[in-house]
């Protein structure tokens, strides 16, 4: 496919956020701000964003707050936005539709 992948924050430390929460709200807030700034920079240097929106917490095609912000940053910067699965049926649906993501329904060949 010829794509270079930029991994999301904490990819190699999936439980880091839970550890930061245990350190207290101030430490967690500082860590979260640092992660959000870092992710914005990653989106800025990328051609597109591919969101792997799988089931989580019992919700199909889950997109959390931080991921929504990444999608918005990509939209703001004019980047392509790909969703692995359809847009979730939740309170962010209209906003997500407005950003015009390309739903690939699991077909990675559509990421071009």
Regions found by a protein language model. Give the residues of each.
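Conserved catalytic or regulatory cores that recognize and/or transform ribose-phosphate-containing ligands
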Residues: 1-112
């Amino acid at each position: 496919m010829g794509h270079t992948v930029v991994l999301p924050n904490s990819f190699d430390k999936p439980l880091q956020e839970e550890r930061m929460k245990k350190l207290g709200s101030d430490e967690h807030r500082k860590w979260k701000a640092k992660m959000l700034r870092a992710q914005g920079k990653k989106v800025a240097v990328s051609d597109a964003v591919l969101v792997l929106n799988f089931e989580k917490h019992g919700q199909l095609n889950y997109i959390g707050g931080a991921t929504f912000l990444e999608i918005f940053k990509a939209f703001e910067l004019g980047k392509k936005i790909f969703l692995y699965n359809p847009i979730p049926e939740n309170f962010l649906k209209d906003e997500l539709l407005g950003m015009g993501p390309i739903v690939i329904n699991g077909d990675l060949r559509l990421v071009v």
